A protein has these predicted regions:
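Acidic, polar-rich low-complexity tracts and alpha-helical solenoid repeat scaffolds
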Residues: 1-228
Length: 228
């Protein structure tokens, strides 16, 4: 790194930009994000090659997100989406970080708009996260049937993504309960408990929801058992 720094801090020449990139790469490999940020910002300002500018902006976006500096992460994500001729995978990354950052900042509208760009993304993991957020938004807006339709899509087309499938089924049980179908809601929760034992957090959530339903229903009908 020291040799590259000598080039960077010396008179600008044909090796200056390449040296900054190499420094950034080395610092990121060492997980020295603090110093990497300094050189990435320098690269962003001075880059002549488009791919180096994109490299700088993309990594700054990720660093700021991981540091919970969500406003800056969003800013750099938006810079990426504004560039022409950017690889679709890089743009998808940008929309994902914009969505997650906006969600963390409580800007649900902006998060929804960013997630919408990912609903049909070739990266299935991005797509299923986007669809889940849409289903959750429908639930919060009391659009329970629409939420369930999205969850059915997740279950049928993204069954390999177990975390999102499990979270979606938990949400589906809430939808059914809000629709007045305590039996179906309970059935789904019992299925989650049985089939996702390798996900203790999911199972705990399902058990808690099932207990709540049984307690509420027991007040309506004393024949409903409270205990599992």
């Amino acid at each position: 790194i020291l040799n590259f720094k000598r080039v960077v801090f010396g008179p600008r020449n044909e090796y200056s930009e390449k040296s900054i990139v190499r420094i950034c790469q080395s610092l990121l490999e060492l997980d020295n994000t603090s110093e990497a940020t300094t050189f990435l910002e320098r690269l962003e300002k001075s880059a002549e090659a488009k791919e180096n500018l994109i490299y700088a902006v993309s990594n700054l976006m990720k660093i700021y997100y991981n540091d919970k500096k969500y406003n800056k992460a969003t800013l750099y994500g938006e810079k990426l989406t504004s560039f022409n001729e950017v690889d679709n995978r890089i743009k998808s990354d940008a929309y994902l970080f914009i969505a997650r950052s906006s969600k963390s900042l409580g800007n649900k509208k902006k998060a929804l708009n960013a997630y919408k760009k990912l609903e049909n993304d070739s990266n299935k993991e991005f797509a299923v996260e986007a669809l889940y957020f849409k289903a959750m938004d429908n639930f919060e807006n009391k659009e329970y049937l629409n939420s369930n339709l999205i969850i059915e899509k997740i279950s049928s087309e993204f069954s390999g993504y177990k975390k999102w499938t499990a979270k979606s089924l938990l949400l589906m049980s809430k939808n059914f309960y809000q629709l007045g179908d305590a039996f179906q809601a309970s059935f789904i929760l019992e299925s989650v408990i049985e089939n996702f034992s390798h996900m203790p957090n999911i199972v705990d959530s399902a058990k808690n929801e099932l207990t709540k339903i049984k307690l509420i229903e027991s007040e309506k009908n004393s024949s409903v058992e409270i205990n599992n």
